[in-house]
């Protein structure tokens, strides 16, 4: 399938506009803290959420709002998570009402999200006072400001869009996301808001999203913490004019492929922007007996704090990788395992058939100092493969999280 990446982010698909402003939730006036994505018509909608038992109030409200598979807008604040508050659900519902009243739509058509400090009450006055400005500023170039408004400890905005064909019709998917810490998903430990002008039923949209999430966001880990507010929401306007997707046909597969491409872009950028991170680390496991084994092994390596620390130090300590494979719970023959490191600096094999082999430390260092490093693991037992995404573990990670509330 031919696919091209374009500008415009979450406002690139037909029917969508976006905006982001500073309303006053955050003390720093230079930081935007309120984002809005809006569609001119009713959308088919789907979402997946954190599996943390401590669940943010916005998720409770959003689940109810899109239980009919419909939505028209997404509103999100940063700075306060609205989690573990006695009046959290009431506040999230009121946030929907404030937004809906300003847009002239039903509050049940709002996806609401919050990100920030857990356990602190959210003051809705700044949101009330800023909503008119937020709505009046909605525009086709607003994805950038919306992406900035949902950031917390992120250092770069995360925004992508792509264009592809469905039944001869030009279709687009756009997305923004945030997340650099508390990323170890059982779904997608961050926020991602995705829009499309494809015509696809809510049922098929949810199916496609679940299919994509398991190979993208679920294979991402920055620090082993699963957050409380994580949401991936998708709105489909249907304005591109394709024949509505209601089954797993060729158009469904093409749409899912495009959605996967966008989500992979987001995941890699989130991994690279992990709190304090200096590099993206991708573990690709091949030669597994089945898909589950490949995923378990790749995720175990990426989640290892010792592997992360070795990547920070550009240390080719392959023993830590075998250790992570060994405790992963996967049924593998460690005596068959080969390990290589690869990057723009070159490629080097450091382990063969589960044992160390002579290698150049100088070349290994050259490979591992690059800002994108691949850990290549071959189990040599089958034909299945999987990739997991993460980053190195640095001094700055501790500093950022030690100072988070200040």
Regions found by a protein language model. Give the residues of each.
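A structural signal for small-residue-enriched, beta-sheet-centric alpha/beta enzyme cores
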Residues: 1-90, 94, 100-406
């Amino acid at each position: 399938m031919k696919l091209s990446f374009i500008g415009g982010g979450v406002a690139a698909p037909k029917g969508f506009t976006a905006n982001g402003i500073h309303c006053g939730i955050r003390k720093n006036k230079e930081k935007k803290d309120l984002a809005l994505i809006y569609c001119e018509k009713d959308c088919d909608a789907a979402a997946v959420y954190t599996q943390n038992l401590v669940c943010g109030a916005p998720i409770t409200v959003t689940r109810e709002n899109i239980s009919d598979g419909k939505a028209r807008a997404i509103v999100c604040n940063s700075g306060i998570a609205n989690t573990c508050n006695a009046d959290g659900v009431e506040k999230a519902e009121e946030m929907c009402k404030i937004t809906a009243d300003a847009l002239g739509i039903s509050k049940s058509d709002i996806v609401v999200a919050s990100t920030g400090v857990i356990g602190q009450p959210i003051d809705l006055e700044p949101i009330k006072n800023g909503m008119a400005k937020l709505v009046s500023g909605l525009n086709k170039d607003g994805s950038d400001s919306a992406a900035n408004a949902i950031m917390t400890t992120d250092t770069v905005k995360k925004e992508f869009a792509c264009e592809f064909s469905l039944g001869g019709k030009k279709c687009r998917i756009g997305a923004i996301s945030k997340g650099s810490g508390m990323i170890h998903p059982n779904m997608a430990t961050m926020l991602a808001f995705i829009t499309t002008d494809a015509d696809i039923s809510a049922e098929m949209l949810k199916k496609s999203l679940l299919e994509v999430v398991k190979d993208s966001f679920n294979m991402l880990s920055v620090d082993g913490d699963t957050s409380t507010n994580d949401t991936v929401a998708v709105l489909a306007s249907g304005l591109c004019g394709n024949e509505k997707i209601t089954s797993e046909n060729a158009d469904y597969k093409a749409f899912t492929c495009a959605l996967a491409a966008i989500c992979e872009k987001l995941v890699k950028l989130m991994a690279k922007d992990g709190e304090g991170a200096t590099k993206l680390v991708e573990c690709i496991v091949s030669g597994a007996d089945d898909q589950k084994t490949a995923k378990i092994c790749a995720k175990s390596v990426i989640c290892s704090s010792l592997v992360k620390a070795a990547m920070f130090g550009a240390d080719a300590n392959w023993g830590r990788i075998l250790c992570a494979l060994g405790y992963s719970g996967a049924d593998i023959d460690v005596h068959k395992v080969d390990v290589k490191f690869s990057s723009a600096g070159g490629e080097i094999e450091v382990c063969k058939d589960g044992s160390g082999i002579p290698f150049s430390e100088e070349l290994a260092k050259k490979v591992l100092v690059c800002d994108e490093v691949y850990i290549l693991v071959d189990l040599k037992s089958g034909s299945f493969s999987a990739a997991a995404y993460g980053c190195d573990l640095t001094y700055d990670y501790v500093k950022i999280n030690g100072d988070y509330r200040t």
